[in-house]
């Protein structure tokens, strides 16, 4: 049975992402994991960080790869398939590499359930749009939006992976102490890992040039931007010798 594109769920999902991002800005609070776990109410169950990250990121990978598997196989298929492969690559890393290497604190079960629901919904939205709704001209591969967007995606993913590596090296296995991250973009901002992922999804939005992708990029900017802001405050309060010239998210600006 051939699946056709229905714009209503695509627009509804995109509007939901944009609304969630706006609510994050209005509430002005960070998500309660990692450095901000102390804000979680007592009695809330926790999951080991590695298990939580693996299970919550897995749906986006499974959904995107599952939809790709049903498409005709070729080295360079329709642009939508190639773009969905980039989306899948991000979640492959998050699911099978990042989750196994992370040394983070236990993850609140409530936040885990929310993150899992988000990954299911967003994975379905992005994959459904790119496979069944997206229409690109034959010359899209040479369009500046595609080429620059893919460049930003790869650049952002590289920054994110390198920054995560830097953070892991600050802590020996079993340690729960915090140290000042240095090197790379941490020279300029406290949330280098967040900045990398924001750049990544802005690049994805440019390359896809779609409402769902821009909605996802907006949500990412709001969510990770808020995390970066509170991470910066955390470092300033904890370390008296924290670099005063370092910003929260955007070098020299914010």
From Swiss-Prot:
InterPro entries: 3-oxo-5-alpha-steroid_4-DH (IPR016636), 3-oxo-5_a-steroid_4-DH_C (IPR001104), SRD5A/TECR (IPR039357)
Keyword entries, A-Z: Differentiation, Endoplasmic reticulum, Lipid metabolism, Membrane, Microsome, NADP, Oxidoreductase, Sexual differentiation, Transmembrane, Transmembrane helix
Pfam families recorded: Steroid_dh
Catalytic class of the enzyme: oxidoreductase
Cellular localisation: Microsome membrane; Endoplasmic reticulum membrane
Cellular component terms (Gene Ontology): cell body fiber; endoplasmic reticulum membrane; neuronal cell body
Keyword Transmembrane tagged: yes
Membrane topology type: Multi-pass membrane protein
pH dependence: Optimally active at acidic pHs.
EC number: 1.3.1.22
Swiss-Prot/TrEMBL catalytic activity: a 3-oxo-5alpha-steroid + NADP(+) = a 3-oxo-Delta(4)-steroid + NADPH + H(+); 17beta-hydroxy-5alpha-androstan-3-one + NADP(+) = testosterone + NADPH + H(+); 5alpha-pregnane-3,20-dione + NADP(+) = progesterone + NADPH + H(+)
Tissue expr: Expressed in high levels in the prostate and many other androgen-sensitive tissues.
Gene Ontology molecular-function annotations: 3-oxo-5-alpha-steroid 4-dehydrogenase (NADP+) activity; 3-oxo-5-alpha-steroid 4-dehydrogenase activity; amide binding; testosterone dehydrogenase [NAD(P)+] activity
Superkingdom assignment: Eukaryota
Chain ranges passing through the membrane: 8-28, 72-92, 146-166, 206-226
GO biological process terms on file: androgen biosynthetic process; androgen metabolic process; biphenyl metabolic process; bone development; cell differentiation; dibenzo-p-dioxin metabolic process; female genitalia development; hippocampus development
Family according to the record: Belongs to the steroid 5-alpha reductase family.
Function: Converts testosterone (T) into 5-alpha-dihydrotestosterone (DHT) and progesterone or corticosterone into their corresponding 5-alpha-3-oxosteroids. It plays a central role in sexual differentiation and androgen physiology.
Protein name, per record: 3-oxo-5-alpha-steroid 4-dehydrogenase 2
Organism: Rattus norvegicus (Rat)
């Amino acid at each position: 049975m051939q699946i056709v594109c229905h714009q209503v769920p695509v627009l509804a999902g995109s509007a939901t992402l944009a609304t969630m991002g706006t609510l994050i800005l209005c509430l002005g609070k960070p998500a309660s994991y990692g450095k901000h776990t102390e804000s979680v109410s007592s009695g809330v169950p926790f999951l080991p960080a590695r298990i939580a990250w693996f299970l919550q990121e897995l749906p986006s990978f499974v959904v995107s790869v599952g939809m790709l598997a049903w498409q005709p196989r070729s080295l360079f298929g329709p642009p939508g398939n190639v773009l969905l492969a980039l989306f899948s690559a991000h979640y492959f890393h998050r699911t099978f590499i990042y989750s196994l290497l992370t040394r983070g604190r236990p993850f609140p079960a409530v936040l885990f359930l929310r993150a899992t629901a988000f990954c299911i919904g967003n994975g379905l939205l992005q994959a459904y749009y790119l496979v069944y709704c997206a229409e690109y001209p034959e010359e899209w591969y040479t369009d500046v939006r595609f080429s620059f967007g893919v460049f930003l995606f790869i650049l952002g993913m590289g920054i994110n992976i390198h920054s995560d590596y830097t953070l892991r090296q600050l802590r020996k296995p079993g340690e729960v102490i915090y140290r000042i991250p240095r090197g790379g973009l941490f020279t300029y901002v406290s949330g280098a890992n967040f900045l990398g992922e924001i750049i990544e999804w802005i690049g994805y939005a440019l390359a896809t040039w779609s409402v769902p992708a821009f909605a996802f990029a907006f949500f990412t900017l709001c969510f990770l931007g808020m995390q970066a802001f509170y991470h910066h405050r955390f470092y300033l309060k904890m370390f008296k010798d924290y670099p005063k010239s370092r910003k929260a998210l955007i070098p020299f600006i914010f």
